[in-house]
Amino acid sequence: MKRTIKYTIPEDFDGKKVIAYLRGEAKISARLLKSLKTVENGITLNGEHIRTVDILHTGDELKIEIPCPDGEIEPMNIPIDVIYEDDDLIAVNKSPFLACHPTHNHQGDTLANALAYHLKNEGKQSVFRAVGRLDKGTSGIVICALNKHSAAKIPKTAEKEYLAVVSGKTEKFGTIDKPIYRPDPMKTLRAVGEQGDRAVTHWETIATDGEKSLVRVWLETGRTHQIRVHFASIGMPLVGDGMYGTDEMKLGHQLLHCAKVSFVHPVTGERMTLEAPMPEDMRKIVDKCFGE
């Protein structure tokens, strides 16, 4: 299968080279461009094969065909909440009880398997290219790119906002700037330590009852378990987080939800914002503790 993208050349690129448009205007990565040169009809101009050094003229139709090979993920009929879908990406509101991709503990019951099934039924490729994965136990928006171009472009413009319920009473605003490292390479556990990589987390308190706080969180960096590790490091672990705190309420997952993602569409150039509601158990706790 292939994803075909067509461009009509504007006046300001009249007389310029194909590569100037593809790299400068269409933002095609150097890696993908190199790949397209080896594909039959990977790059054509007005229906004819061309070189990237050839000259463009106003009104020309430039077309690229991006190969979309099938993946090796086994399709599984698992219900998912699709909140947006087009030819270049699909966005899902992930359940906290669903892992993003297969591991030794989860071979067939993952978001990747569910998306493979969904996309197969729609006649689309099923290579799993998640743009920022979420931990099992974290709910919310996961974007999956449907081709190499989308996979290269979306992460460069994506901005995420999370909602979290943390233990204790937080200040109105706060920033945690502490490096994070992996103490044991055989385990997923992370910790704060000077030998780690830079990690910065910002938050704003939405509501608090003195014992718990609902916070809006956004990140400067994207370290594994960053939000969970950072709040635990200041004595305010996420409610339900059995790894970095305790799960006294027996929720089975931390109350952390990716509620909003904003990004520039890889083909149209439109700034898009997607939002997703909290899972039911998190919503009930938020309503009970902080009001509706």
Question: Where would I find each of the regions flagged by the language model?
Answer:
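RNA pseudouridine synthases
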Residues: 1-292
